[in-house]
């Protein structure tokens, strides 16, 4: 498994696509009740690219994210992250790879109520052989002054910052976010999106954000749209994407 992770790190330093999804298919149910949720999705993202995946409820966005993150299996297709074809990994290696190399941020924070902000993040720090320095991370997330507080003592936005810190502390190459601002009011949502942009600048991880909110697309290098399980748009945001990355 260590050699697998080493290959992922080496691949991340090249100019190839960091995340490559080919022919991804997923359905639920059987026979007449069978529903195709993803229909042959092809996506390639560069290292450090921010991708916003848009689409109405039921379009397959969360299923796509779950499969890319190894939380669900695909019916067909392959997923390569940092040079590692994770769809080929046996279950035990996939679990270890996911813990070490992927970060997840969800709409609901799922913080441990009896742990402080620092302790909630430290829980995930030990899963990585190369974690980020805790003090630096807390400061960059604006949580330093709240580090000894418990979840019930901080706001929803601060709780989401803590959840982001929990995902980042492992120093992942790929950060997967499912409606990260869905439970927040407008002003706090704006702050969290600005934080995600800062995270991308500071740590260079590839970020995929799933949302139904078109307003989020301004922060993306790439904008994907799903409709009824099909990829109907794959657009580059040339206003913020460096020219050297306009090749994907």
Where are these regions (language model features)?
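Pre-NBD coupling/linker segments of ABC/ABC-like ATPases
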Residues: 2-13
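ABC family nucleotide-binding domain
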Residues: 17-220, 225-226
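Conserved beta-strand-loop-alpha-helix hinge in the C-terminal portion
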Residues: 230-248
């Amino acid at each position: 498994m260590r050699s697998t992770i080493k290959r992922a790190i080496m691949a991340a330093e090249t100019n190839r696509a960091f995340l490559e999804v080919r022919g991804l298919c997923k359905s639920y149910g059987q026979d007449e009740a069978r529903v195709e949720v993803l229909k042959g999705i092809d996506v390639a993202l560069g290292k450090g690219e921010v991708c916003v995946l848009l689409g109405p409820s039921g379009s397959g966005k969360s299923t796509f994210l779950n499969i890319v993150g190894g939380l669900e299996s695909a019916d067909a297709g392959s997923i390569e992250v940092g040079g590692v074809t994770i769809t080929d990994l046996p279950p035990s290696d996939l679990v270890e790879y996911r813990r070490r190399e992927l970060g997840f941020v969800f709409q609901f924070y799922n913080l441990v109520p009896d742990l402080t902000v620092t302790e909630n993040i430290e829980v995930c720090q030990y899963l990585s052989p190369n974690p980020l320095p805790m003090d630096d991370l807390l400061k960059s997330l604006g949580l330093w002054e709240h580090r000894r507080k418990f979840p019930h003592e901080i706001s929803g936005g601060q709780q989401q910052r803590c959840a982001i810190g929990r995902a980042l502390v492992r120093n992942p190459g790929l950060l997967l976010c499912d409606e990260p601002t869905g439970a927040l009011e407008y002003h706090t949502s704006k702050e969290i999106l600005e934080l995600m942009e800062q995270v991308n600048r500071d740590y260079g991880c590839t970020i995929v954000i799933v949302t139904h909110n078109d307003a989020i697309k301004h922060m993306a290098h790439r904008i994907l749209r799903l409709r009824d399980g099909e990829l109907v748009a794959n657009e580059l945001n040339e206003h913020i994407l460096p020219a050297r990355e306009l090749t994907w």
